[in-house]
């Protein structure tokens, strides 16, 4: 059996998903493709890496196989027996660009196992299994947005997701006359070893200091009670949630000018308050600001490298791409990669 699971891009709502916040992602037309078949032992093959790993029983290797192994462990923890299988994976998703290749791999694995063994679990349960794999087995304390979007993606729609209640709404993504591009800074971030988990701890500390259970209970007034660093982190989360709500409204009204401005202000907040951007992504956003037809841009993903989402009028980005590429190369001696992004449906058999 063969399945595919999409990556995702988050229009806005960065570092809110693990803080019970709002997010506005959509599944993208770049996928992890996965084939599953019975086997005498566990065999995991990656076409992209041209590598095969065999194991008698599931174990953690601190490698790409952990995403698959973690999913199998999560099934077993729930009492499902997963006998040895061969899983072959290929992908046209760029790694580390902020498109969440890891969640796509987890979702593809979870869906394939569920169908192959006849468990036929509902998608939401598979989302929870995939997330558990990343949090408990891989060791990255991610929110639920990435796996959720890979599962529930719908072509020509973004997902307005409340990560506290998991209530969601499909918002039409009518891009006629506009386009979304991803600029990959080609500065790589290893999430588990970066500041990502530290930001999570800081956010937990905010709640502890304020005596609150969730960020949804935190008010602007509460910020005054916090020491400087924690105040900045909390301010970003509160204001980013507001930006998501405004962005949903803008999308519904087809107001891409407003959406673009919200992207720029999101980046400023990620840079100055949450402090997860880096020199390279700041350079890209600053370069794009004020250019004709460029409506908005911001860093996407965990931060410290990765990608920049760019919202523009159709054709406007194409006109300045080379200039941006040259300026970036001159400054950092690194080549940029560009991806035009379109929406896609969620995980499915092929």
Swiss-Prot record:
GO MF: ATP binding; galactokinase activity; magnesium ion binding
Reactions catalysed, as given in the entry: alpha-D-galactose + ATP = alpha-D-galactose 1-phosphate + ADP + H(+)
Record: residues binding ATP: 46, 96-102
Any GO CC annotation of this UniProt entry: cytosol
Pathway involvement of the protein, from the record: Carbohydrate metabolism; galactose metabolism
Alphabetical keyword list: ATP-binding, Carbohydrate metabolism, Cytoplasm, Galactose metabolism, Kinase, Magnesium, Metal-binding, Nucleotide-binding, Transferase
EC number(s) reported in the record: 2.7.1.6
Keyword Methyltransferase: no
Pfam families: GalKase_gal_bdg, GHMP_kinases_C, GHMP_kinases_N
GO biological process terms on file: galactose metabolic process
UniProt-annotated binding residues for substrate: 14-17, 196
Site (Transition state stabilizer): 8
Active site: 146 (proton acceptor)
Localization per record: Cytoplasm
Annotated binding of Mg(2+), by residue: 102, 134
Enzyme class: transferase
Role, per record: Catalyzes the transfer of the gamma-phosphate of ATP to D-galactose to form alpha-D-galactose-1-phosphate (Gal-1-P).
Protein family according to the UniProt entry: Belongs to the GHMP kinase family. GalK subfamily.
NCBIfam families noted in UniProt: gal_kin (TIGR00131), PRK03817.1 (NF003006)
Name of this protein: Galactokinase
Source organism: Thermotoga neapolitana
